[in-house]
Amino acid sequence: MKFAWIRPNGTWNDRKEAIVDSLESGFDHIMDLDNAETIKKLGSVTIISDKEDSDITLLGLNNKITMADIKKAQESGKEVAAYVEINNKDDELLVSKLGTVADYVILKGKNWKVIPLENIIASLQNRTSKIIVDVPNYEEAKLALETMEHGSDGVLLSSNDGNEIRKLGALIEKVSKESYDLKAATVTKVESVGIGDRVCVDTCSMMNVGDGMLVGSFASGLFLVHSETLESEYVASRPFRVNAGPVHAYVMTPENKTRYLSELEAGDEVVTLNSKGEANTVIVGRVKIEKRPLLLIEAKYKNSRIRTLVQNAETIRLVNDKGEPISVSKLKVGDKVLAYFSEAARHFGMAIEEQIIEK
């Protein structure tokens, strides 16, 4: 997931305005060497600096550093960001070494046309650190994040310009969007199975018709369970909510990871997406677990057979192959519903290559 840090400059009033713009644009990592305590009065902020009161330790801003310097700084328990100005091949070699130990490597180039940034990033494919490019404006941030085949993980915008900061916020949201290749699975079973503990996920975002969450009993496939965006004769719409399924079910979270529905709580992040597979990351505001009658749904796509359980109610919907919500009370064998399939198994929510049987 792409990200940005902001480095304001000038007088405190200039910096203050830029920091407020940053927070309002979703950026809470600020590089500032002088005003950590004052900045933190403006909001919940992570400070990157070379001072002891920093949250992330900055090394190399004014001097060359070594791998030993990084390791020593990490003994404090803080993350370490290594700042390297690229002027020659020796600097490129230094970056390749620091990238194996530092948590972040910030690259500053005086002339990327002479020393191509893309080549440096491509040489760091085995790195453990996040690569950040120091940029003076939005256009160079866009180049670093979006244009190159091997873009950086993030950017450090050294600017006080509120318009530039807000444009960068919109860009980060755009390039960080995930997408999922949804398939039309054929329903093979719809069966009432009795009472169980079902989870409603209330988010901090309003969803639209066609939006939902990926939920299912198997790691190999998750159904697109529709949000409560439609009115019914029984209840008003709740466009921030997905009545997702029972406590054991997987739900998709950012970076293609899953959580159990029962694990979710306020402040966690989950993925919502539309029928085209275009995804957004949203914040969980509340989770409700209640005993409700459940319905078992099974579907098949090619050689993959998947299952999920949902509350047995007219207001619970999946999404059909036309991108339209369909109530589970009307679902029948032979209907087509959208689902996401994966050949990977799951270990602590992460996709892994492992043979696994789910039934």
From Swiss-Prot:
- The enzyme class is oxidoreductase
Recorded GO terms, molecular function?
3-dehydroquinate synthase activity; dehydroquinate synthase activity; NAD binding
- The residues the entry assigns to the signal sequence are none
Q: What is its EC number?
A: 1.4.1.24
Which Pfam families would you find in this protein's record?
Answer: DHQS
Q: What are the GO BP annotations of this UniProt entry?
A: amino acid biosynthetic process; aromatic amino acid family biosynthetic process
Alphabetical UniProt keywords? Amino-acid biosynthesis, Aromatic amino acid biosynthesis, NAD, Oxidoreductase
What InterPro entries does the database record attribute to this sequence?
DHQ_synth (IPR002812)
Which cysteines are cross-linked by disulfides?
A: none
Under catalytic activity, the entry for this protein gives: 2-amino-2,3,7-trideoxy-D-lyxo-hept-6-ulosonate + NAD(+) + H2O = 3-dehydroquinate + NH4(+) + NADH + H(+)
Q: Indicate the family of this protein.
A: Belongs to the archaeal-type DHQ synthase family.
Question: In UniProt terms, what function does this protein have?
Answer: Catalyzes the oxidative deamination and cyclization of 2-amino-3,7-dideoxy-D-threo-hept-6-ulosonic acid (ADH) to yield 3-dehydroquinate (DHQ), which is fed into the canonical shikimic pathway of aromatic amino acid biosynthesis.
* Name of the protein in its database record: 3-dehydroquinate synthase
Give the organism, scientific name: Methanosphaera stadtmanae (strain ATCC 43021 / DSM 3091 / JCM 11832 / MCB-3)
The lineage, from the top, is:
Archaea, Methanobacteriati, Methanobacteriota, Methanomada group, Methanobacteria
